[in-house]
Amino acid sequence: MGIEGILEKGFVTTSIDTVVNWSRTGSLWPMTFGLACCAVEMMHAGAARYDLDRFGLLFRPSPRQSDLMIVAGTLVNKMAPALRKVYDQMPEPRWVVSMGSCANGGGYYHYSYSVVRGCDRIVPVDIYVPGCPPTAEALIFGLIQLQKKIRRTNTIAR
């Protein structure tokens, strides 16, 4: 008795959390925060070959319209307040993906005086995508992991 048996009876039973989380995973609207070469791979993931639209991701130009921030590239001290300001402008619930070695922990420029050693010192990060630069496949895998994480959360119980 699959979905056909349920549809014959005319109703489906589920919880509100399941429906809300299902809709959130299918309509993530990322805002790009491209700081260096990782942003090129992020654009590659949104182009025709990989097409993030099929996962429900639609890039938005404004933080007030997005619920996901992808931090891609080297974060320097001068840019850190802008990152926090943009994060604070995003509506709840919001998620952050740290893309690339530089965003994760400073990367190649870790010992430079002007580099923040990981964007998780400025904003809370949900998913880390490793690589220098990470491939489009790695970013897509990270976004799928974020969708799985969203499905596991209890929205109403918060």
From Swiss-Prot:
Membrane topology listed for this record: Peripheral membrane protein
Cofactor(s) it depends on: [4Fe-4S] cluster
Keyword Translocase set for record: yes
GO molecular function terms noted in the UniProt entry: 4 iron, 4 sulfur cluster binding; iron ion binding; NADH dehydrogenase (ubiquinone) activity; NADH:ubiquinone reductase (non-electrogenic) activity; quinone binding
Cofactor-binding details, from the entry: Binds 1 [4Fe-4S] cluster.
Record flagged with keyword Cell membrane: yes
List of residues binding [4Fe-4S] cluster: C37, C38, C102, C132
GO cellular component, one term: plasma membrane
InterPro entries: NADH_UbQ_OxRdtase-like_20kDa, NADH_UQ_OxRdtase_20Kd_su
Main location, first listed in the record: membrane
Gene3D superfamilies membership: 3.40.50.12280
Reactions listed under catalytic activity: a quinone + NADH + 5 H(+)(in) = a quinol + NAD(+) + 4 H(+)(out)
Cellular localization per UniProt: Cell inner membrane
EC code(s) of this entry: 7.1.1.-
A GO BP annotation: electron transport coupled proton transport
Keyword terms: 4Fe-4S, Cell inner membrane, Cell membrane, Iron, Iron-sulfur, Membrane, Metal-binding, NAD, Quinone, Translocase, Transport, Ubiquinone
Enzyme class at the top of the EC tree: translocase
Top-level taxon of origin: Bacteria
Signal peptide: none
UniProt record similarity statement: Belongs to the complex I 20 kDa subunit family.
Record's subunit section: NDH-1 is composed of 14 different subunits. Subunits NuoB, C, D, E, F, and G constitute the peripheral sector of the complex.
HAMAP family attached to this UniProt entry: NDH1_NuoB
Task of the protein: NDH-1 shuttles electrons from NADH, via FMN and iron-sulfur (Fe-S) centers, to quinones in the respiratory chain. The immediate electron acceptor for the enzyme in this species is believed to be ubiquinone. Couples the redox reaction to proton translocation (for every two electrons transferred, four hydrogen ions are translocated across the cytoplasmic membrane), and thus conserves the redox energy in a proton gradient.
Listed name of the protein: NADH-quinone oxidoreductase subunit B
Organism (species): Acidithiobacillus ferrooxidans (strain ATCC 23270 / DSM 14882 / CIP 104768 / NCIMB 8455)
Gene behind this protein: nuoB
